[in-house]
Regions:
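Surface-exposed binding/hinge segments that line
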Residues: 23, 80, 127-173
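Ligand-site clamp/hinge motif
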Residues: 181, 209-255, 384
């Protein structure tokens, strides 16, 4: 799509909100996002757009604080380990789904069952397998007790069932809908807000769920509206049409902060912005030396200082300091070395063939600007780069010989390496299933080690395994990290809200209030 058309689309969306919404505030909170998800079923897709809205609609058995990662009871009142492979959950009584039906163990079993997830061709499996591929069974012990069992010992069961893809849905709602195709038109959760309408590419309208078991939602109505153009989001915020806007670039922080009615919040989150390579579809990308050359050609420090005013940090490896003892600082040494990049590219046998890099104009903060800057760096290293602007993820990730590089983010959905690089690269993950990764000795070994990372309960061994995985990935990179993804927001001053370390927005009574 022509960038001018994106601007028009953003203006139209803003006008639609202005025409249909009352004054922004606790009666009708409006959040302007750069892109809405194409589906609001929690296992429908894995991306930042769905992360942003799912937290308001659905709940997991365990809740993890979005700022600290600390556990607190969700749909389960308590839980205990019964073996290295199993956790037993005692479910909360008196919880209602948005359609008024009772939440019981049957809903938990169905959520992870054959029809939705466990079967090989189940509709939720493609997105959720990266998170829950090791699940063996979810058994009903009684109406308010379930036992989750993994295929092998797993030190992270509790983390997995507090993260995305583990949100509980209504079995009764699914059955009445007659299956996935109708269900996704009006999915039902237990969260503080319920869906009233959803139009892809336009708006997602929610309302306070009066039957919610916990503290009532602070906003009577909550609307997410798609406004791709930054200037339209900013204009809507200044005029009072929007309460909160996403994807604010650093150069807008000072101008917006000078507005006495607006606050700017946020910063780097536990998510690494990166380039992903299809090393299989086109022989140009097959040689690991060429991909290593790309890794060393990018000046991450310059990107962070010049484009993000130091509001984020460079990433030289796929790690987060929230990993604690599993964080390996020795892998964070600077990768930028232009001479080394040129030598590796020459050694790869590269002959100047065009390398296509598919991007979207503004899915990520400054996506176009960053892509142009990095493309310039890669050209200095001797690569013939062509940026190919696409409208959506379907076009970006469509199979073909011109699928060579695309932008992506690597969220750490919980503070452990298993939640980030390995989750996105393991067998059965989206990119592996879509044919991005060719067979190689390094990838085979990474997969062997990844299984051990998922199953070992020995912290010392897990740390050693993770270090070996990072070494192998540097030797044959299928992606290269750039920086921690910044998530900067601007909001009305009467909105009391702070973002966490994830892309999810907590707009419940725990996270939101109004002055």
């Amino acid at each position: 799509m022509n960038p001018k058309n994106f601007a028009k689309a953003g203006l139209v969306a803003a006008l639609v909100v202005a025409a249909n919404a009352s004054v922004a505030g606790p009666d009708n909170m409006v959040v302007a996002v750069q892109q809405l998800p194409v589906i609001v079923e929690p296992q429908g897709i894995n991306n930042n757009a769905l992360d942003r809205v799912a937290y308001s609609i659905y709940e997991t058995l365990i809740r993890a604080d979005l700022k600290t990662g600390e556990f607190f009871p969700g749909l389960a009142e308590s839980w205990k380990r019964v073996s290295p492979e199993s956790v037993e959950f005692k479910l909360r009584k008196g919880v209602k789904f948005h359609d008024g039906t009772d939440f019981t163990a049957d809903d938990v079993v169905f959520t992870f069952g054959q029809e939705r997830f466990m079967a090989k061709d189940a509709p939720g499996r493609a997105a959720a397998v990266e998170f829950l591929g090791g699940l063996k069974s979810v058994e009903k012990i009684d109406d308010y007790t379930v036992r989750v069992t993994m295929q092998q010992a797993d030190p992270l069961i509790e983390r997995r069932f507090a993260a995305r893809m583990s949100e509980i849905i209504s079995k009764d709602g699914w059955m009445k809908a007659g299956g996935w195709d109708n269900w996704i038109k009006n999915p039902i959760g237990t969260g503080p807000y319920r869906i009233t309408s959803f139009k892809v590419g336009n708006r997602l309208a929610l309302e306070r769920f009066d039957g919610y078991w916990g503290d009532k939602a602070p906003a009577a109505k909550l609307t997410f509206v798609e406004v791709p153009e930054l200037s339209s989001r900013v204009a809507g915020l200044r005029s009072g049409e929007f309460d909160l806007i996403t994807e604010v670039p650093p150069d807008q922080i000072k101008p917006l902060s000078k507005d006495g009615k607006i606050d700017v919040v946020g910063g780097a989150i536990d998510n690494i912005y990166a380039l992903v390579f299809d090393a299989k579809s086109n022989p140009v990308m097959a040689n690991p030396k060429l991909r290593q050359g790309i890794m060393h050609a990018i000046d991450r420090d310059l990107l962070v200082q010049a484009l993000f005013a130091g509001k984020t940090t460079p990433a030289n490896s796929f790690q987060s300091k929230t990993f604690g003892e599993m964080y390996l600082p020795e892998f964070e040494t600077k990768k930028f070395d232009l001479q080394k990049a040129r030598e590796l590219i020459k050694a790869s046998g590269y002959k100047g063939e065009q390398i296509v890099w598919r991007i979207q104009p503004a899915y990520y903060t400054l996506e176009m600007t960053v892509s142009q800057a990095v493309a310039s760096m890669l050209k200095q290293a001797g690569l013939n780069i062509r940026l190919d602007v696409k409208e959506n993820w379907t076009q970006v990730e469509a199979a073909g010989k011109d699928r060579m590089i695309n932008n992506a983010s690597f969220s750490a959905y919980f503070p452990d390496p298993a939640s980030q690089l390995w989750r996105r690269m393991k067998p059965g993950s989206f990119w592996e299933a879509e044919g991005y990764f060719p067979a190689s000795d390094e990838y085979k070994r990474i997969c062997e080690l990844g299984k051990e990372l998922d199953s070992s309960v020995d912290p010392v061994r897990r740390k050693a395994v993770w270090g070996e995985m990072l070494k192998l990935f540097d030797a044959n990179p299928y992606a290269v990290p750039l920086y921690s993804l910044p998530m900067i927001y601007a909001k009305q001053k009467n909105v009391v809200w702070e973002p966490g370390t994830q892309g999810s927005l907590d707009l419940s009574a725990r996270g939101l209030s109004f002055k």
